[in-house]
């Protein structure tokens, strides 16, 4: 489903724990990391698409998370020219995304990236709140920065967030030169990737 401007409607998912860390996922068979995300199907609301993608990509169900916040506006990024499919009609030039901030309320052992036959990810880890903004692929960086800034304004403002989940000192920006933290790795089950993202 592509809109009139050539953007594909999409949802982005940020899952946090009580330490103020966020789930960072490794793309299947690649050394590339990102937040879970996926397209919105015809007839779906953004929230319905989010819960579907949450199960397909991370193996979590609605009962396993608490929805803390959803971005107010659509956030857009354009695909690099090398990723454009000029023979597709209509042509998709990028994604427009609604972002959701979720709190994990179950044990992390429930995270299972092999719920489907063609998983998007083969590993994950917890990282500091701002770490993904610096580490994501460059063409998604501005959208990540805007989404995380909006989430931070909610999480760390006691007048907007009555849960008082995190403290500022738990979300300092990660330095780019630091060693990558340990991640949960899944053994490959097949060689097929899922839909183009």
Curated annotation (Swiss-Prot):
GO CC terms in record: cytoplasm
Disulfide bridge partners, by residue number: none
Chain residue ranges for the region called Disordered: 170-197
Keyword match Hydrolase: yes
Enzyme class: hydrolase
Claim: GTP-binding is one of the keywords in the record: no
InterPro entries: Nudix_hydrolase, NUDIX_hydrolase-like_dom_sf, NUDIX_hydrolase_CS, NUDIX_hydrolase_dom, RppH
Cofactor(s), by name: a divalent metal cation
GO biological process assignments: mRNA catabolic process
Molecular function GO terms recorded: mRNA 5'-diphosphatase activity
Entry EC no(s): 3.6.1.-
Location of the motif Nudix box: 38-59
Record Pfam families: NUDIX (PF00293)
Nudix hydrolase domain location: 6-149
Key words, A-Z: Hydrolase
Function summary: Accelerates the degradation of transcripts by removing pyrophosphate from the 5'-end of triphosphorylated RNA, leading to a more labile monophosphorylated state that can stimulate subsequent ribonuclease cleavage.
Similarity comment text for this entry: Belongs to the Nudix hydrolase family. RppH subfamily.
Alphabetical list of HAMAP family matching this protein: Nudix_RppH
The protein's name: RNA pyrophosphohydrolase
Lineage: Bacteria, Pseudomonadati, Pseudomonadota, Gammaproteobacteria, Pasteurellales
